[in-house]
């Protein structure tokens, strides 16, 4: 996932990305959050062009964006100016989703984004992802949790860096995933 995300910002043989891209990291501690920043700043960093007033970031615009996503995605905090670490892990992950969904990205890469997140948060985010997909956003979702595949239209099974199976949601079975992953399908 990180290689695809990196390809969006530079020319690379064989990969062409023609739309804005955002990443929702599963390992929020190392790849996702900015630990010294507020919740609002963590959400707004992907939307700087919209938040600027001249050369500076408009605190009002940043607060409006953060407030909108606090309500829409249900980030549980009284003050979006609190440090990101004041949130639970699930709410930190919601802030990362808010960063991606609040941006201009038409493609959202999700790198095992629900790892270690409670079931309530997962269900809320699944609903939001489906809503955004219906509105035209594309999601590329790497997951280690097979139940998350129910949220996908197409499933690609990878083995040794290559696609070994392309399944529609209707074709999806755990048996086909395991067979593709561990069989001689390469």
Q: How would you describe each model-predicted region?
A:
Residues 1-186:
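Glycine-rich phosphate-binding loops of nucleotide-dependent enzymes
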């Amino acid at each position: 996932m990180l290689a695809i995300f990196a390809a969006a910002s530079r020319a690379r043989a064989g990969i062409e990305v023609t739309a804005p891209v955002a990443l929702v990291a599963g390992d929020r501690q190392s790849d996702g959050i900015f630990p010294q920043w507020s919740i609002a700043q963590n959400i707004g960093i992907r939307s700087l062009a919209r938040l600027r007033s001249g050369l500076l970031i408009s605190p009002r615009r940043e607060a409006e964006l953060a407030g909108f996503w606090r309500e829409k995605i249900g980030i549980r905090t009284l003050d979006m100016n609190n440090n990101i670490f004041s949130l639970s892990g699930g709410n930190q992950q919601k802030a990362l989703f808010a960063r991606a969904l609040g941006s201009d990205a038409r493609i959202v890469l999700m790198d095992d984004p629900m790892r270690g997140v409670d079931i309530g948060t997962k269900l809320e985010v699944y609903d939001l992802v489906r809503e955004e997909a219906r509105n035209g956003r594309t999601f590329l979702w790497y997951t280690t949790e097979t139940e998350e595949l129910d949220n996908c239209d197409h499933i690609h099974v990878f083995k040794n860096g290559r696609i070994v199976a392309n399944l529609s949601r209707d074709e999806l079975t755990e048996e086909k995933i395991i067979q593709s992953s561990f069989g001689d399908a390469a």
